[in-house]
UniProtKB/Swiss-Prot annotation:
The gene is NPY4. It comes from Arabidopsis thaliana (Mouse-ear cress). Pfam families: BTB, NPH3. The lineage of its organism: Eukaryota, Viridiplantae, Streptophyta, Embryophyta, Tracheophyta. This is Phototropic-responsive NPH3 family protein NPY4. Pathway: Protein modification; protein ubiquitination. The BTB/POZ domain mediates the interaction with some component of ubiquitin ligase complexes. Coiled coil: none annotated. The modification Phosphotyrosine is found at residue 391.
Length: 481
């Protein structure tokens, strides 16, 4: 971290309890400055020579007699940065050594501006020195710029607003730079896809800046992302990755417990910042945001916007992404997906997704039959390379709902095309006592056709085996497919 030292004298400031500060020298106190519950016992000359504000507000004695008996008292509790920033300004006036760094420079700069410690009253005054430090050092440092920006959130002054703009400009400019020119340190701890270990020859990743900005409060983060987007040099998918990293940092795991601890405005802000283009946000992240918007009771327009975004990338979604949804919501997503007139390959992916979802949801003995049928029938026209996972869902439903009638069981099994079961699935089905006898006969019939085709030299193309990875992934006969 960069820093700047001002002054050469040793520290002669002492404290009396928590609320009194004074300077040790032979001169008597001439002025008391009150800031909140803290009182500073000081001398006029060092202050008046550098502060226009104090010159205006401290009375001067008319004669020596009055001067001996008079102690001016002034309350400036409204000073930005409070007593800590004011004490640094005072020490500067006394020539006492002070150290400025990214953590305190903004507060001191605002306090100095409040006290009018500018060039009008003394050349190279405190405001000037701080501005030189900011421009030559702080705003040229990536991490210091972020720290400085973070410290502005508790300061309410026109001067702090100007500093925020300068910080944002520095951060946006640095984040937008060509990665080949990035020579400074940055934080990069996220796992990359396929557990790829980055090598020096890989160069600096495009999203190198993402994690450092996660330290910012949401209001400042919003301004930083907008400033970066306005530069127009950072790809939308990197912006999406930045928002994902920030959300994960603030909402651990997107669990109900973690979401109970956050404010709705956090989710609303992240949603507002999402890139509009399809594919720049992962489907997994979109589903997490959508679930969070439902859980937190966000506005309907927000929830509908996210539902549409999820449906647009439904073919990229995994079963784990949608397991937290109820069947009505998943059916709504499927219908939204169908309204886009999707291509065949997308339909195949979504059919596989929903089959896997039903296989998991069927484990719930309280799942209504009509809900199961309604969702499954919504995709009845979708092409599937294999009906293995659909069979798995049907078998699990029959296992957990053994009390349904024969006609209901027949309707459930009617969802499946026995011709599209793999050999392993057929082997399981013919031994499955939960299936109606008619279905077992159909399976045996098509297996016979398959066997006859093999004996005559014609073989049916092997169907793709589809397995959903779950903790309880075994059939009753301890066979997987």
């Amino acid at each position: 971290m960069k820093f700047m030292k001002l002054g050469t004298k040793p520290d002669s400031f002492l404290s009396k309890g928590d609320n009194v500060r004074y300077v040790t020298n032979e001169l008597e106190t001439e002025i008391i400055i009150i800031i909140g519950n803290v009182k500073f016992y000081l001398h006029k000359f060092p202050l008046l020579s550098k502060s226009g504000f104090l010159q205006k507000h401290i009375a001067t004695s008319k004669n020596e007699e009055e001067k001996k008996n008079q102690i001016d008292e002034i309350d400036i509790s409204e000073i930005p940065g409070g007593s800590v920033a004011f004490e640094i300004c005072v020490k500067f006036c006394y020539g006492i050594t002070v150290t400025l760094n990214a953590y305190n420079v903004v507060a001191v700069r605002c306090a100095a501006e409040f006290l009018e410690m500018n060039e009008t009253f003394e050349k190279s005054n405190l405001v000037y020195k701080i501005d030189v430090f900011l421009n030559s050092t702080i705003f040229r440092s990536w991490k210091d710029s972020i720290i400085v920006l973070q410290t502005t959130k508790d300061l309410l002054s026109d001067d702090s607003e100007e500093l925020v703009k300068r910080c944002l400009g520095s951060i946006a400019s640095t984040a937008s730079i060509d990665t080949s020119k990035v020579k400074w340190s940055y934080t990069y701890n996220r796992k990359k896809k396929l557990e790829k270990v980055r090598k020096p020859e890989d160069g600096v990743p495009k999203d190198w800046w993402v994690e450092d900005l996660c330290e910012l409060h949401i209001d400042l983060y919003k301004q930083a992302i907008k400033a970066i987007k306005n530069r127009g040099k950072v790809p939308s998918n990197v912006i999406g990755e930045a928002l994902h990293a920030y959300a994960i940092r603030r909402i651990a795991g997107f669990s109900k417990e973690s979401m109970q601890l956050i404010d709705r405005s956090l989710i609303n802000t992240i949603i507002e910042l999402l890139p509009d283009e399809k594919g720049n946000i992962s489907s997994s992240f979109l589903t997490k945001l959508h679930r969070a918007s439902i859980f937190l009771g966000c506005e309907e327009t927000v929830k509908e916007k996210l539902k549409k975004r999820v449906s647009e990338q439904l073919e990229e979604t995994t079963v784990n992404d949608i397991l937290m949804y109820d069947l009505d919501m998943v059916q709504s997503l499927v219908k939204e997906f169908m309204n886009r007139d999707p291509k065949t390959h997308s339909k195949v992916s979504v059919a596989k997704l929903i089959d896997g979802y039903l296989a998991e949801k069927s484990r719930d003995p309280n799942l209504p039959l009509q809900n199961f049928l309604s969702l499954a029938e919504t995709l009845s026209s979708f092409p599937r390379h294999s009906h293995d996972v659909l069979y798995r869902a049907i078998d699990m439903f029959l296992k957990e709902h053994s009390g349904i009638s024969k006609s209901e069981k027949k309707r459930v099994c009617g969802l499946m095309d026995c011709r599209k079961l793999s050999a392993e699935a057929c082997e399981h089905a013919v031994q499955n006592e939960r299936l109606p006898m008619r279905v077992i006969v159909q399976v045996l019939f098509f297996e016979q056709i398959r066997a006859n085709g093999s004996s005559t030299g014609y073989s049916t193309p092997e169907l793709t085996t589809t397995t959903l990875n779950t903790e309880d992934d075994e059939w009753d006969h301890e066979k997987e497919f």
